[in-house]
């Protein structure tokens, strides 16, 4: 079974509340399966693991349908929000201390802490350009790929070390490619 960390799950209702208010949260919660609704209404442990389909993908799909006219690219914004949440306080200072290349190396270790089983590799990491790949993630969904891309984009912005930053997803396991690939460019 593929699982998602509570650290990723806890940010979903936070994102809804910040962007659509309490009414948006209630509208979203009312459409969830009862057992999933109870998870989201409770205090979510960031150390707990959840079934990715039931507790993460379907609720995120619902968010996209309710508030973004079904556009899965909204998950990119969820990822950005998650980076702001996860990289705050002392971690934000730590992120700002390293170079972009250092952070990209670390991202390949950090991101797999959100999803299991998965692997992430960095086959290219040079000045101004890097490639990150996910060669193994059983049943990955496009929503997860977008969320990871948005997380990386925002995390790299937080470093404050790059200008003209772009993160582009160039391959997709969900679409049948041999890996999910992100190309990162900066100056």
What are these regions (language model features)?
Residues 46-147, 164-165, 171:
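Amphipathic interaction/junction segments at domain boundaries or subunit interfaces
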Residues 146-160:
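Short, non-transmembrane amphipathic alpha-helical segments
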Residues 20, 32, 67-68, 111, ...:
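A broad structural signal for alpha-helix termini and local helix breaks/kinks
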